[in-house]
From Swiss-Prot:
Pfam families: YwcE (PF17368). Belongs to the YwcE family. The chain crosses the membrane at residues 1-21, 25-45, 55-75. Its main location: membrane. Keywords: Cell membrane, Germination, Membrane, Transmembrane, Transmembrane helix. It comes from Bacillus licheniformis (strain ATCC 14580 / DSM 13 / JCM 2505 / CCUG 7422 / NBRC 12200 / NCIMB 9375 / NCTC 10341 / NRRL NRS-1264 / Gibson 46). This is Spore morphogenesis and germination protein YwcE.
Length: 86
């Protein structure tokens, strides 16, 4: 759970870093982050059901996918476009 909490802290700051490069991706990453904090609160109060655990892991995976898509959009596409224009 420590790794999840560490990722949650890093993920919470991600929209701030993405805002200058791509506002749509930054805004799309906010709802999963909010939901992950809600599920984390339920986990810490021991009131999270097995379904809640599954949803929390699904949100974690969704946020990882969004982060990778954002990294590709921000860093990968410009690099590919630069190499294609040569």
């Amino acid at each position: 759970m420590d790794m999840f909490f560490a990722y949650l802290l890093i993920a919470s700051a991600t929209p701030l870093f993405l805002w200058l490069d791509n506002k749509k991706v930054a805004i799309s990453s906010i709802p999963p982050i909010i939901l992950m904090w809600v599920f984390f609160f339920f986990y810490m109060t021991s009131s999270l059901s097995p379904t809640g655990h599954s949803l929390m892991i699904a949100l974690f995976i969704l946020n990882v996918v969004i982060a990778h898509v954002a990294a590709f959009i921000i860093y990968g596409l410009p690099l590919i476009r630069k190499h294609m224009s040569r």
